[in-house]
Each structure stands twice: as structure tokens, then as C-alpha cells.
Amino acid sequence: MGIIDFLLALMQDMILSAIPAVGFAMVFNVPHRALPWCALLGALGHGLRMLMMSAGFNIEWSTFMASLLVGSIGIQWSRWYLAHPKVFTVAAVIPMFPGISAYTAMISAVKISHLGYSEPMMITLLTNFLKASSIVGALSIGLSVPGLWLYRKRPRV
């Protein structure tokens, strides 16, 4: 893949991830003045995740680093725009939730329930369940760590 193709794919990924970020921000009743910032933050987070995954990182670490970026920028923007950081960050990380892994794990569990135990189906269930759980954990830890770092009252040393 050439650099132009990669940049076009990255831009497409960022634009397509900004749409659900704005949609969920509207569902969460985010003020209208914050909607473009939610879209931008969702695009930046998802773009960083895609960039890291194309560089060879796995999806869990890429998601963790992207949610760290989203949390850090959200805290800074909350200071500038006098809003709570969750206004920007929660809707921005929703496009990174592991829908396909969770769905595949759920379908595998239903198949095991109806058809009986089979080792390949159990491997599929456990693999996708652990992947989805790891991604959700990376999102939650990545969003909370910048707040712990930046709002710390004591010196770090």
C-alpha cells in the first residue's frame, strides 16, 4: 500500500468514526457547541488507533493509547470550554468499542448452548470474549488515567 492510499484510508477511517461520535453525543444531549469537538476527538482517537495498528501494534494496545490521547485532549478542552471532560470523551471513544468481537463471542455462546460443546466453538468464544474484554478495559483505563495524572494534588515524586 502506498503512502497516498494509506493517507486516504486513514482519512476515510477518521471521517467515518466521527459520524457515530457525533450521533452518540447527540443521544447523550451534549451541547451543540461541543458537537464538532466530539467529532474531531472521535476522529483523532480512531485515527491514532488505526495508525498504531498499521504500524504493527495489536488492537488492545492501540486502543489504550488512543483512549489516553482522547482522555488527555478531553481534559484540556474541558478547561478551555468550561465543560466536563466526559462531554467530549465518552462519545469520542464509542466508535472504538469492540462490537464485532463481542458479537462473535455471543453468537459462539448461543451456538454452544444450542448445538452442544465443541472445541473450535469454545476457542472462538474465549478468544473473542477476551479480546472484547481487553479492549473495553483498555478504553476505560485509558480514559481514567489522564484524569488521575492531571488532577493529582500531591507531587509525583
Curated annotation (Swiss-Prot):
Provide the GO biological process annotations: succinate transport
Residue ranges spanning the membrane: these are: 8-28, 34-54, 55-75, 87-107, 129-149
List the Pfam families hit by this protein, alphabetically: ThrE_2
Record keywords: Cell inner membrane, Cell membrane, Membrane, Transmembrane, Transmembrane helix, Transport
Q: Does the keyword Transport apply?
A: yes
Xref: InterPro entries:
ThrE_2, ThrE_Dicarb/AminoAcid_Exp, YjjB
According to Swiss-Prot or TrEMBL, what is its membrane topology? Multi-pass membrane protein
NCBIfam families for this protein = PRK09917.1
Q: Its biological function? A: Involved in succinate export with YjjP. Both proteins are required for export.
Show the PANTHER family listed in the entry. SUCCINATE TRANSPORTER SUBUNIT YJJB-RELATED, UPF0442 PROTEIN YJJB-RELATED
Q: What is this protein called?
A: Probable succinate transporter subunit YjjB
- In its UniProt entry, the species of origin is given as Salmonella typhi
Q: What is the lineage of its organism?
A: Bacteria, Pseudomonadati, Pseudomonadota, Gammaproteobacteria, Enterobacterales
Q: Which gene encodes it?
A: yjjB
